[in-house]
Structures are given as structure tokens and as C-alpha cells.
Amino acid sequence: MAAVLEENGCSRQSSPGAGDSDAEAGDTARHKLESLLNRNMRIEMTDGRSLIGCFLCTDRDCNVILGSAQEFLRPSDSFPVREPRVLGLAMVPGHHIVSIQVELESVTSPQYI
């Protein structure tokens, strides 16, 4: 096993010969995340709330930062559908994320995949 120093200064152990496939998988994941930057997305949370905002960044713990975020509450018997609450910059802890939907490139109305 060899120690590998990553860009952020962290080191990790790697086995001989496995570095090439790990690097390719890491590059693919990185490119996928980069393609999502500045795209609108909807995040469903464990407590039933939904946040819609612009994807700005994430980290190793899967926390997500949304810009210009709006919060939507799940309608219930005691709370009817209300106007969204404007949050601005919001950090969503990764362990509270149920699903993420990315807005399709559309000129008309926002559609999520």
C-alpha cells in the first residue's frame, strides 16, 4: 500500500495497480459535479421540506450549499399550501437529504429530472 497525497492535502492509502481506475472514477465524478454547478435543483429533506436553489458546492460529507434558496413546506391538515420562504444562502446537511432533482435546461417553466 502506498500513501497518496490529494489536492486538498489529505492523504489516503491506495493499493498498487488500483490507482488508475480510482483516478478515472474520481475524474468522472468530479466532471459530473462540475456540470451541475450553478444549476437550479430541488432538494427534498427528511422532515418534508423542499428547498429550491442554485447549486454552489458540496463537500465530502455530502452537505450541499444552495444559493438564492427558497423553502417549501409540505402541506398538511394544519398547514395549507403557503408561499415559499426566501432563505438566500442555505446549507443542507447531507444526512437530511432524501432526494435531489436537477432542473432541465428549459426556457419555459422549470422542470426537474
UniProtKB/Swiss-Prot annotation:
Residues 28-106 form the Sm domain. Residues 1-29 are annotated as: Disordered. CDD domains: LSMD1 (cd06168). Transmembrane segments: none annotated. Auxillary component of the N-terminal acetyltransferase C (NatC) complex which catalyzes acetylation of N-terminal methionine residues. N-terminal acetylation protects proteins from ubiquitination and degradation by the N-end rule pathway. GO terms for molecular function: RNA binding. It holds the Pfam family LSM. The keyword Thylakoid does not apply. It is found in: Cytoplasm; Nucleus. Keywords: Cytoplasm, Nucleus. Component of the N-terminal acetyltransferase C (NatC) complex. Belongs to the snRNP Sm proteins family. It comes from Xenopus tropicalis. The lineage of its organism: Eukaryota, Metazoa, Chordata, Craniata, Vertebrata. This is N-alpha-acetyltransferase 38, NatC auxiliary subunit. It comes from the Eukaryota.
